[in-house]
Amino acid sequence: MQFLDELKWRGLLHQTTGGDELQKHLVSGSRIAYCGFDPTKDALTIGNYMPIKILRHWQLAGHKPIVLMGGGTGLIGDPSGKDAERQLLSKEQVAKNIEGQLRCFSKVLDFEGEHAAIIVNNADWLCELGFLDVLRDVGKYFSVNTMIQKDSVKDRLNNREQGISYTEFSYMILQAYDFLHLRRKMDCTIQIAGSYQYGNIVAGIDLIRRDMTGSPEDQFRGAGITNPLVTASDGSKIGKTEKGAIWLTEDRTSPYAFHQYWLNIPDEDAGKFLRWFTFLDQPTIEAIEKEHAESPHQRATQKALADAMTEIFHGSENVERCNDAAKALFGGDIKSLDETMLSEVFAEVPAGEFAKSSLGTEAASLVELLPQTELCKSKREAREFLQNGSVAINGKKVAGDTAIACVLTSDDLLHGSTILLRRGKKAWFASRWV
């Protein structure tokens, strides 16, 4: 399947420039495309993943991808999608952010072989440009009349409180120069980006055309390919939760939390996300959706999505661990979880510390202990929950006549330090014994 056709059936294609000439260009040989990444953070989120994935589809189609790190433009700040001036980052912070982001690309792209991906940093050429050089050789090709029509600029100009600085106003010129530089030095003819970057892409193509004045008419100048905004069906941003962003690296979002995020995607988005985010082929996805339609409660689409995404960024071993943890949590044996997974699974539940020396004494009885947690408010309420069989220790219900007299002991400790208490099906508390 051709590259653009692959993007179309997956719903990843928003706009292109170049028309039929672009298609001819792509099928007539191996080409080079780039996508830029803004180093505002030291890691990438799910929202940053789509362009990386598109670069991988580009690579699988027999073309070469370039990952452009914005070490130069990151010192300026992209005004696109921002209603206020960005806080300028230091050179040291930008360099640190780039180093952190680089961890993600090798999870998706192949950096070896005939179509090996390469990484470049636009600081290598932008920081070498003199101010007068930019004004004379680049700035003269940009019409301010056109630049102020760009949505990100227009919105800021209409905001009397914020406005837009000359620094951010110049971002479009620098991004266009990136495309020109890669066209000159690496024969890169395609820029891939989100739909909000369309205006910047067109500016870069126009700069290339002006630079190539006098070149043969049939020589391809450049083109852009954009993907749609990464949003859920309700319009919300993907990868944002009440507890924060979902990151692509284990130090920011654990494999279990990552897996759970995809498992909890609503039905109306799950099929679309399978196409957008995984590399499963069309027949496989259609078979999964058919299975889901026949038994929606089994959530086949979400399970396939969670497993596929977790395998990409955390490996097949963590997929298995996450599924085992889910089984243990919902009816299995919590004691079977290793210490790392136990910490991941219960990282977000309420927790408190207690004296290990009190285990086996009246102070560690459930009637005394439960009111000190967020599971109940009083000893009376604790007794009611115990009598009703609503309380579980490490996933095992405490029931029968002896429930009220139950006392936690060292035998209940998981990995020597933790006892998990649950009221009902979902209210958990992690007691740490020190």
Each model region followed by its residue ranges:
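NTP-dependent nucleotidyl-transfer catalytic core
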Residues: 1-197, 201-205, 212-223
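Conserved nucleotide- and phosphate/pyrophosphate-binding catalytic cores
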Residues: 207-434
